[in-house]
UniProtKB/Swiss-Prot annotation:
Effect listed in the UniProt record for changing residue 188 to E: Reduced homophilic cell adhesion
GO-annotated biological processes: angiogenesis; bicellular tight junction assembly; cell recognition; cell surface receptor signaling pathway; cell-cell adhesion; cell-cell adhesion via plasma-membrane adhesion molecules; cellular response to mechanical stimulus; detection of mechanical stimulus
GO molecular-function term, one example from the UniProt record: transmembrane signaling receptor activity
InterPro entries: Ig-like_dom, Ig-like_dom_sf, Ig-like_fold, Ig_Fc_receptor, Ig_sub, Ig_sub2, IL-40-like_Ig
Residue positions, PTM Phosphotyrosine: 690, 713
Biological role stated in the UniProt entry: Cell adhesion molecule which is required for leukocyte transendothelial migration (TEM) under most inflammatory conditions. Tyr-690 plays a critical role in TEM and is required for efficient trafficking of PECAM1 to and from the lateral border recycling compartment (LBRC) and is also essential for the LBRC membrane to be targeted around migrating leukocytes. Trans-homophilic interaction may play a role in endothelial cell-cell adhesion via cell junctions. Heterophilic interaction with CD177 plays a role in transendothelial migration of neutrophils.
Example of a GO cellular component annotation carried by this entry: nucleolus
Biological source species: Homo sapiens (Human)
Protein name: Platelet endothelial cell adhesion molecule
Region spans: Membrane-bound segment which detaches upon phosphorylation: 709-729
Self-association state and partner proteins as the record states: Trans-homodimer (via Ig-like C2-type 1 and Ig-like C2-type 2 domains); trans-homodimerization is required for cell-cell interaction. Forms a complex with BDKRB2 and GNAQ. Interacts with BDKRB2 and GNAQ. Interacts with PTPN11; Tyr-713 is critical for PTPN11 recruitment. Interacts with FER. Interacts (via Ig-like C2-type domain 6) with CD177; the interaction is Ca(2+)-dependent; the interaction is direct.
Organism lineage: Eukaryota, Metazoa, Chordata, Craniata, Vertebrata
TM annotation in the entry: 602-620
Domain comment, as recorded: The Ig-like C2-type domains 2 and 3 contribute to formation of the complex with BDKRB2 and in regulation of its activity.
Length: 738
């Protein structure tokens, strides 16, 4: 059995669950709406740097429940959530202590209630002013040529920050050096500034600039502490020995000294210059010395420079040297001599003081007196100089360049004759003189005209290039410094081979040739060097029917007493050794026709006409003979002759009927007809002649009843010999013979 307190606890637990369930059911039935949301900034949307800023978000929510709903408020800066809170209050705040430039931006607030949300408009927070930067230095004392490191920072702000640091001289407004740097990751920069020679007391000024949105915020300038500058070394000083007037021959000492401070880490370099030439220098001490025997050329301006990595100090002095004697002068009567002429050299000093003279050619002494004379040869060309000495002072004269010119030998001219020269081909003509002083000027003459010039400073031949198109003559002209006239070479004759060009074929007579006449074909070339090989071809024949080689520019082929066989198309080719075998020039096609001669045509016509006339005569003769024969054979046809006809198996037709009988044709039975005796014989191949005859019949025919006169036609046929002539007759008058 459970205790009583346990039973009571169980009861209250059930009541609590019931209330929670009812509350949950009631919440599901309530309705919510967000009327409006708003946002404010205290004290304002624009605030001074370092002040406090409070952002407030307001939410006006309506509900059917008597209990305010719980909602979320979200704070955004530049669309980035930075604060989120759940609350049943209508207002929530976000506090920003000591606002800075980086707090500037676009802010908004979003309220969410049961999956419903509403966002305020965007508000711009602008923080004005940049805190003054802090400036610190790595040292308060510096030496010339050293470095000062300046640290400029804005601890309150965030990067990026743009810093400007200026180097100032105390009590001077002008900025000696200005440097700028943009720090993207840190709110400070460290810059190095050199300490220069003119610097004494320095200070540094720093300024910071920060970009906020589209606005640039600039801080006030902050000055650093003062930096005292000390010299690392002093200005150099000159010491000249001997003092006073310095005469040539004395020993000259020029010394430059400095003082170096204890702060310097190393010695600077000391340099002594005469004009721009360095005459002495030292890197490991506080002085540099230049020692030399004094000569007048040592007079001039001397400069001493003391240089470290960043500092340079300079001082100058002028040194004058008194001349002991003037510079000697070397003279020559001629500087250009022909080989074999006399060379004269003379050395002198203005004022003619006694001195020791020496004349030298390059490094060789040729005379130890003032004068030098000899017959010039090629080896005497060179540079001569004279030296004059008094005590320890030795001076050199000016130099004299002597050129002894050797006469040129006759130039040789040649060309590469290994191959024949073809028209248009480039050839190299060489000109060379074996002996003679350089330089040598060469000229190449082509048919007595200057083609090209060349100057050679060596013994190599001059090479000229040309492209001859015909036989040509070359000559070489050589010249140098010698007074002799120009030298001419022998004449070089170059034979140029011209390739065959433009082959033409022609016939000397008309293209129409009468048979029996000669055909003469000409193959000619426009240009070409001999010997030239000519070949004559007939079209469609691979081999030439005639060929010849000649030095002439034309060749002929003759066919005597041409016939019809020579009719056709012809062409020719021509080439010489300058033509390539693959491209032999060829002529065009020439067509030749062969016709009969007029007298032959006349003879044939006469023969044909004679034959025709003979045939006509024979035909006429036969005709007249037959006609005469026919007239000489009258025949009288009478009745007693009828049996004869009947004996020949011929029948007579009705005398009252007219009948025409044709050879080889049988008329109607009613007609009178006569047939040959032998029907098996061939028909007569004679002409038919009709003869009118008078016939008297011996007896009357029993069937003839008429008694009138009729004309009897007799058909006479010419038969083979011994053939029977048939007669057809009709009688006139009475049939009884009266």
């Amino acid at each position: 059995m459970q205790p009583r307190w346990a039973q009571g606890a169980t009861m209250w637990l059930g009541v609590l669950l019931t209330l929670l369930l009812c509350s949950s059911l009631e919440g599901q039935e309530n309705s919510f709406t967000i009327n409006s949301v708003d946002m404010k900034s205290l004290p304002d949307w624009t605030v001074q740097n370092g002040k406090n800023l409070t952002l407030q978000c307001f939410a006006d929510v309506s509900t059917t429940s008597h209990v305010k709903p719980q909602h979320q408020m979200l704070f955004y800066k530049d669309d980035v959530l930075f604060y989120n809170i759940s609350s049943m209050k209508s207002t929530e705040s976000y506090f920003i202590p000591e606002v800075r430039i980086y707090d500037s931006g676009t802010y908004k607030c979003t309220v969410i209630v049961n999956n419903k949300e509403k966002t305020t408009a965007e508000y711009q927070v602008l923080v004005e002013g940049v805190p003054s930067p802090r400036v610190t230095l790595d040292k308060k004392e510096a030496i010339q040529g050293g470095i000062v490191r300046v640290n400029c920072s804005v601890p309150e702000e965030k990067a990026p920050i743009h810093f400007t640091i200026e180097k100032l001289e105390l009590n001077e407004k002008m900025v000696k050096l200005k440097r700028e740097k943009n720090s993207r990751d840190q709110n400070f920069v460290i810059l190095e500034f050199p300490v220069e020679e003119q610097d004494r007391v320095l200070s540094f000024r720093c300024q910071a600039r920060i970009i906020s949105g589209i606005h640039m915020q600039t801080s006030e300038s902050t000055k650093s502490e003062l930096v005292t500058v000390t010299e690392s070394f002093s200005t150099p000083k000159f010491h000249i020995s001997p003092t006073g007037m310095i005469m040539e021959g004395a020993q000259l000492h020029i010394k430059c000294t400095i003082q170096v401070t204890h702060l310097a880490q190393e010695f600077p370099e000391i340099i002594i210059q005469k004009d721009k030439a360095i005459v002495a220098h030292n890197r490991h001490g506080n002085k540099a010395v230049y020692s030399v025997m004094a000569m007048v050329e040592h007079s001039g301006n001397y400069t001493c420079k003391v240089e470290s990595s960043r500092i340079s100090k300079v001082s100058s002095i002028v040194v004058n040297i008194t001349e002991l004697f003037s510079k000697p002068e070397l003279e020559s009567s001629f500087t250009h001599l022909d080989q074999g002429e006399r060379l004269n050299l003379s050395c002198s000093i203005p004022g003619a003081p006694p001195a020791n003279f020496t004349i030298q050619k390059e490094d060789t002494i040729v005379s130890q007196t003032q004068d030098f004379t000899k017959i010039a040869s090629k080896s005497d060309s060179g540079t001569y100089i004279c030296t004059a000495g008094i005590d320890k002072v030795v001076k050199k004269s000016n130099t004299v360049q002597i050129v002894v010119c050797e006469m040129l030998s006759q130039p040789r001219i040649s060309y590469d004759a290994q191959f024949e020269v073809i028209k248009g081909q480039t050839i190299e003509v060489r000109c060379e003189s074996i002996s003679g002083t350089l330089p040598i000027s060469y000229q190449l003459l082509k048919t007595s005209k200057v083609l090209e010039n060349s100057t050679k400073n060596s013994n190599d031949p001059a090479v000229f290039k040309d492209n001859p198109t015909e036989d040509v003559e070359y000559q070489c002209v050589a010249d140098n410094c010698h007074s002799h006239a120009k030298m001419l070479s022998e004449v070089l004759r170059v034979k140029v081979i011209a390739p065959v060009d433009e082959v033409q074929i022609s016939i000397l007579s008309s293209k129409v040739v009468e048979s029996g006449e000669d055909i003469v074909l000409q193959c000619a070339v426009n240009e070409g060097s001999g010997p030239i090989t000519y070949k004559f071809y007939r079209e469609k024949e691979g081999k030439p029917f005639y060929q010849m080689t000649s030095n002439a520019t034309q060749a002929f082929w003759t066919k005597q007493k041409a016939s019809k066989e020579q009719e056709g198309e012809y062409y020719c080719t021509a080439f010489n050794r300058a033509n390539h075998a693959s491209s032999v020039p060829r002529s065009k096609i020439l067509t030749v026709r062969v016709i009969l001669a007029p007298w032959k045509k006349g003879l044939i016509a006469v023969v044909i006409i004679g034959v025709i006339i003979a045939l006509l005569i024979i035909a006429a003769k036969c005709y007249f003979l037959r006609k005469a024969k026919a007239k000489q054979m009258p025949v009288e046809m009478s009745r007693p002759a009828v049996p004869l006809l009947n004996s020949n198996n011929e029948k007579m037709s009705d005398p009252n009927m007219e009948a025409n009988s044709h050879y080889g044709h049988n008329d109607d039975v009613r007609n009178h007809a006569m047939k040959p005796i032998n029907d098996n014989k061939e028909p007569l191949n004679s002409d038919v002649q009709y003869t009118e005859v008078q016939v008297s019949s011996a007896e009357s025919h029993k069937d003839l009843g008429k008694k009138d006169t009729e004309t009897v036609y007799s058909e006479v046929r010419k038969a083979v010999p011994d053939a029977v002539e048939s007669r057809y007759s009709r009688t006139e008058g009475s049939l009884d013979g009266t």
